[in-house]
Structure formats: structure tokens, C-alpha cells
From Swiss-Prot:
One Pfam family linked to the record: Ribosomal_L22
Biological role stated in the UniProt entry: This protein binds specifically to 23S rRNA; its binding is stimulated by other ribosomal proteins, e.g. L4, L17, and L20. It is important during the early stages of 50S assembly. It makes multiple contacts with different domains of the 23S rRNA in the assembled 50S subunit and ribosome.
Source species of the chain: Alcanivorax borkumensis (strain ATCC 700651 / DSM 11573 / NCIMB 13689 / SK2)
Family (UniProt): Belongs to the universal ribosomal protein uL22 family.
Record gene name: rplV
PROSITE patterns noted in UniProt: RIBOSOMAL_L22
Keyword line: Ribonucleoprotein, Ribosomal protein, RNA-binding, rRNA-binding
Subunit structure: Part of the 50S ribosomal subunit.
Protein name per its UniProtKB record: Large ribosomal subunit protein uL22
Lineage: Bacteria, Pseudomonadati, Pseudomonadota, Gammaproteobacteria, Oceanospirillales
Gene3D superfamilies in UniProt: Ribosomal protein L22/L17
Domain of life: Bacteria
Gene Ontology terms: biological process: translation
GO annotation, cellular component aspect: cytosolic large ribosomal subunit
Length: 114
């Protein structure tokens, strides 16, 4: 009986492209291995994904009474969020547009022997 428990972070201040690099590394791992990998990854997205994963683990433990040692990362996906547009002044009265991208990170953990 594999129940999935999710945690979501909406509007994370990192581009979806960069966050997906980290999300692809932890997909399918046991939570202990995933947390260890994220702890020592130098990427900014690793810290963010780690917090979402810890939240999903806490949700599974407190809401569903799941055994933490049996949990594994069943699903991780990163969707694009809102893009904030900013202006950078340039020479001769011109201006460039800066796109501050955000993303939505979803992590699902399941307890099961799939």
C-alpha cells in the first residue's frame, strides 16, 4: 500500500531550468540518500529542494504516520511560475528587460516497495 504525500513550494526565486537539474538527481531515491545528496550539492536549487523534501517527509510522518526509513522520493517536478519583469537602463536612453523567473517545486514521497 503506497500512499503518496506531497509538499509544494510556489514562487521559488530560481528559474525552473536550474531547479530541474537538481530535481532530476533526487527522483526515485530513498529519502535518506536524497537528503544527503542535496546537503552536499553546491547548487542554490539544492537548498530549496531540500527544504521541500523535508516538508514532504514531515507531512508523511505527522499526517499519515509513515515510517521515515521506508520513504522514497516517488515524484519531483518543477513548473514555471510567474516571471517578474524589471528594467536595466542602458546607454543613449535605451533599456533592457530583465526577467526574474520563479518556479513551483512539488515533491511527493511514498512508502512502499515498488
Amino acid at each position: 500500500m503506497a500512499t503518496e504525500v506531497a509538499a509544494r513550494l510556489r514562487g521559488a526565486r530560481i528559474s525552473a531550468q536550474k531547479a530541474r537539474l537538481v530535481a532530476d538527481q533526487v527522483r526515485g531515491l530513498e529519502v535518506e540518500k536524497a537528503l544527503n545528496l542535496l546537503e552536499f550539492s553546491p547548487k542554490k536549487a539544492a537548498k530549496i529542494v531540500k527544504k521541500v523534501l523535508e516538508s514532504a517527509i514531515a507531512n508523511a510522518e505527522n499526517n499519515d504516520g509513515a515510517d521515515v526509513d521506508e520513504l522514497k522520493v516517488s515524484t519531483v517536478f518543477v513548473d514555471e511560475g510567474m516571471t517578474m519583469k524589471r528594467i536595466r537602463p542602458r546607454a543613449k536612453g535605451r533599456a533592457d528587460r530583465i526577467l526574474k523567473r520563479t518556479c513551483h517545486i512539488t515533491v511527493k514521497v511514498s512508502e512502499g516497495q515498488e
